[in-house]
């Protein structure tokens, strides 16, 4: 299963970007053994529209244009479900075993996602009740992708 990340906003060069790349590199090196592959990180600029609703709609349109068809969509959203690392790994394994070819995980901009994006989501994922800066949300997501592979491979990185 090909996994892509769609992110509104661009990472600045620095420690956060290095950490995201490190986790994606670790993921890519060991994910093939469990039928997962990292396809791409697609970054789009934040909308400059005047209202939050307009910005979310514009960013949502960019997401829909980028979605391969057919694909599954996980949307990172504060209204989503907070799950354990094992439950997240099981969700990805379920999609893979179901024969899903493309999975896109979407990180929204400062305003979040539009209602249309949330409605299209196959799963709404929350990183908990706290608000996270965009760079840290990317780190959390990429670390969990790597952790998913370590869980599937029974690697000691994830302590059971």
From Swiss-Prot:
InterPro entries: Alpha/beta_knot_MTases, RlmH-like, tRNA_m1G_MTases_N
Localization, UniProt: Cytoplasm
Binding locations of S-adenosyl-L-methionine: 108, 127-132
Reactions the enzyme catalyzes: pseudouridine(1915) in 23S rRNA + S-adenosyl-L-methionine = N(3)-methylpseudouridine(1915) in 23S rRNA + S-adenosyl-L-homocysteine + H(+)
Protein keywords: Cytoplasm, Methyltransferase, rRNA processing, S-adenosyl-L-methionine, Transferase
Keyword presence, Protease: no
Record-stated family: Belongs to the RNA methyltransferase RlmH family.
Protein name: Ribosomal RNA large subunit methyltransferase H
Native organism: Bartonella bacilliformis (strain ATCC 35685 / KC583 / Herrer 020/F12,63)
Protein encoded by which gene: rlmH
């Amino acid at each position: 299963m090909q996994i892509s990340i769609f992110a509104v906003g661009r990472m600045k060069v620095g420690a956060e970007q290095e950490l995201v790349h490190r986790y994606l590199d670790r993921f890519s090196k060991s994910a093939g053994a469990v039928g997962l592959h990292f396809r791409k990180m697609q970054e789009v600029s934040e909308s400059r529209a005047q209202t939050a609703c307009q910005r979310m709609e514009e960013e949502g349109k960019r997401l829909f244009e980028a979605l391969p068809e057919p694909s599954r969509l996980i949307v990172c959203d504060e209204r989503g479900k907070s799950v354990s690392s094992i439950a997240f790994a099981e969700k990805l394994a379920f999609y893979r075993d179901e024969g899903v070819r493309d999975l896109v995980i979407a990180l929204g901009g400062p305003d979040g996602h539009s209602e249309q994006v949330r409605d299209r989501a196959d799963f709404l994922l929350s990183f908990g009740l706290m608000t996270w800066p965009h760079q840290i949300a990317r780190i959390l997501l990429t670390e969990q992708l790597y952790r998913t592979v370590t869980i599937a491979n029974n690697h000691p990185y994830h302590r059971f």
